């Protein structure tokens, strides 16, 4: 028997019961049987509309599968509304794995040739482009690389009478001869086409941006690393979607509103969300901190990466040990060539140790204060605080003062220079970067012993009843809080010891300090000690009866028995420490999974609540019914994208500019 639609099954049931009811009634059957059939008919009608009614067993298929009836077809994520009306599958799209390519501009996306061959852009034939379209068709459907440049082919020609003609190598000449004005040529993807690029989950508007195409060999989409944060992408196997825009208006709209450079600054916090990351930061920091000297050859090599054309940095000369003249360029001068004219900034660098005063940071031996005067870097190292996303003051200033185009050009240049210098200089990190001298290890062991001794003293006071409870806390809570404080201090002290012995000549420390990757806490856990493991903000207390593991005595409240890890990752954890560490890690994983589903549902509710709000012509925020929600957008009328970290005006910059103009005027 042919498999029928579930609704057909239900309708068959309804008709069958109706017939039986009529036959029984006409035959004068007993009241009981008629009522039974009457109820059965009600059951079939109910399940025809909704097969998940509470208190009613669902109607099932012969195989035992519950039937999918009218209500189930409309409801929920897989239902008609959300699955087929709000969201549809589309043509002219591609999906594949993503890879990094630091040589592309942030505006570009590398598209595999296979994708470019399949995806097409409609070109309407006019008298002006008639010859161009003829040439396209004559090439046939196979794209070519001529003199290193990609040349697209044509897949279809749509005649004015709406007939589609597939272009092949055999019929290309014939189709070209019969080409008329008004036809549409479906051209394959070409360099410079505007496409939309998206990564799911699409959580904010920067998860879908417009890029220009660069057709490349290979089978993955390529894009530049600064674009990772808005998409929240990494290259461990993520896939992304590409949509080819078909209309001319849509293309213009995407280019003006959605292009990557138009979204460098985020409406979430009024700062750049696209910025230099990882290698770019460590490269530029090493290029500018303490102003190193680069040989003229090396400087030329680095600048050639960005196709530099402009005022070359100042060239200096010095005699080397053999008395030969050596020509060199200062790193800061090289960096200054990337800056647009007229920049004056002064701020702390990210590498500055916490607690260091500005006066100390400005000392040449420290060099942790960035000073840019008239677009010349005078002091400090360029790090996370200058060019990274979210925190990058210099990048933010360029985007604000000179516009998105200038910010994009600066970002493209600064990332290439950072990579170029790092490649030239060499930069390696290994497990040996976490090695501490014996003196440091002894100091850390002494601190661990002191902590354990202090915890034992607290336990003795608790058992004797000498421990004073904190206001509003029980004795047990007070003990736990005091022990947590002691173990926390132990980890901090070990971190300080590790930091004292690991200097900026250590690659891992340099990465952490300049903000390229990792933190000093990560390093202190690798080299010093891991510290107290916590579950739900408390020491680990669950496990066996009166103890956490069978390796401890009953009622043991000491540091090790409750999850204090005194070892470092480098030295390795013993089995009990490893177990406690896994408990802490497991909590993190569960927390992440729970948070994701909660926030997803919350965002959905928020979107549904706010989807009909817009700023009306009179500047008020209204819904479709015309109800006023706000008299001025955001109560202050400030566009968060153009704000300065949420503030409407950057007063410090204005004061500094006025002071400078006063000095120049001699007043």
Residue ranges and their predicted role:
Residues 7-13, 237, 410-420, 600-615:
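Hydrophobic/aromatic-rich, well-ordered segments within soluble, folded domains that form packed cores
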Residues 1-264, 331, 335, 368, ...:
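Core mixed alpha/beta domains of very large multi-subunit molecular machines
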Residues 2-5, 89, 273-277, 401-411, ...:
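Structural motif
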Residues 80-81, 121, 133, 140, ...:
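Intrinsically disordered, low-complexity regulatory segments
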Residues 13, 323-424, 539-586:
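Function-dense linear segments that define catalytic or interfacial modules
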């Amino acid at each position: 028997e042919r498999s029928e639609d579930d609704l057909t099954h239900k309708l068959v049931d309804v008709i069958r019961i109706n017939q039986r009811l009529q036959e029984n009634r006409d035959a004068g059957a007993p009241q009981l049987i008629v009522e039974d059939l009457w109820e059965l008919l009600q059951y079939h009608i109910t399940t025809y509309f909704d097969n998940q009614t509470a208190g009613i067993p669902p109607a099932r298929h012969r195989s035992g599968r519950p039937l999918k009836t009218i209500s189930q077809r409309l409801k929920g994520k897989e239902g008609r509304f959300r699955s087929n009306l709000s969201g549809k599958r589309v043509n002219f799209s591609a999906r594949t794995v993503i890879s990094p390519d630091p040589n592309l501009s942030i505006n570009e996306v590398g598209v595999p040739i296979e994708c470019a061959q399949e995806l097409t852009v409609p070109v309407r034939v006019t008298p002006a482009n008639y010859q161009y379209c003829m040439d396209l068709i004559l090439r046939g459907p196979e794209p070519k690389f001529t003199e290193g440049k990609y040349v697209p082919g044509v897949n279809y020609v749509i005649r004015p009478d709406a007939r589609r003609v597939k272009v092949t190598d055999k019929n290309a000449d014939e189709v070209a001869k019969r080409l008329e004005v008004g036809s549409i040529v479906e051209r394959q993807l070409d360099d410079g086409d505007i496409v939309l690029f998206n990564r799911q989950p699409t959580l904010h508007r920067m998860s879908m941006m417009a890029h220009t195409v660069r057709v490349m060999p290979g089978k993955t989409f390529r894009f530049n690393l600064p674009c990772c944060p808005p998409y929240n992408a990494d290259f461990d196997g993520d896939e992304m979607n590409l949509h080819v825009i078909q209309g001319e208006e849509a293309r213009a709209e995407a280019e003006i509103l959605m292009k990557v450079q138009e979204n460098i600054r985020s409406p979430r916090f009024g700062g750049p969300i696209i910025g230099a990351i990882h290698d770019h930061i460590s490269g530029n920091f090493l290029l500018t901190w303490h102003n190193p000297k680069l040989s003229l050859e090396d400087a030329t090599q680095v600048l050639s990466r960005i196709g530099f054309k402009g005022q070359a940095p100042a060239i200096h000369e010095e005699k080397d040990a053999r008395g030969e003249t050596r020509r060199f360029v200062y790193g800061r001068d090289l960096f200054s060539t990337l800056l647009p004219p007229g920049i004056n900034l002064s701020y702390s660098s990210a590498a500055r140790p916490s607690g260091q005063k500005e006066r100390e940071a400005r000392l040449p031996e420290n060099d942790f204060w960035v000073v840019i005067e008239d677009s010349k870097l005078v002091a400090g190292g360029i790090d996370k605080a200058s060019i990274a996303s979210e925190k990058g003051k210099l990048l933010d200033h360029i985007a604000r003062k000179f516009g998105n185009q200038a910010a994009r050009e600066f970002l493209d240049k600064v990332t290439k220079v950072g990579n170029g210098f790092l490649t030239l200089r060499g930069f390696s990190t290994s497990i040996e970067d976490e090695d501490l001298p014996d003196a440091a290890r002894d100091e850390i062991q002494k601190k661990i012993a002191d902590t354990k001794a202090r915890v034992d003293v607290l336990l003795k006071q608790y058992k004797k009843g000498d421990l004073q409870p904190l206001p509003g806390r029980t004795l047990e809570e007070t003990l736990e809080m005091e022990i947590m404080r002691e173990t926390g201090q132990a980890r901090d002290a070990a971190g300080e010891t590790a930091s004292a012995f690991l200097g900026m000549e250590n690659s891992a420390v340099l990465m952490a300090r300049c903000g390229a990757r990792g933190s000093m806490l990560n390093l202190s856990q690798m080299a010093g000690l891991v510290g107290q493991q916590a579950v739900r903000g408390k020491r680990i207390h669950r496990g066996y009866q009166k103890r956490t593991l069978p390796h401890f005595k009953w009622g043991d409240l000491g540091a090790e028995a409750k999850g204090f890890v005194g070892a470092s990752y480098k030295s390795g954890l013993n089995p009990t420490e490893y177990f406690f560490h896994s408990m802490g890690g497991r909590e993190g994983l569960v927390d992440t999974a729970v948070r994701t589903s909660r926030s997803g549902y919350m965002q959905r509710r928020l979107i549904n609540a706010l989807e009909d709000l817009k700023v009306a012509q009179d500047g008020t925020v209204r819904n479709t019914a015309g109800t006023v929600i706000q008299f001025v957008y955001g109560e202050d009328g400030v566009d968060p994208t153009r704000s300065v970290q949420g503030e409407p005006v950057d007063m410090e910059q204005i004061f500094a500019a006025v002071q400078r103009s006063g000095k120049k005027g001699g007043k």
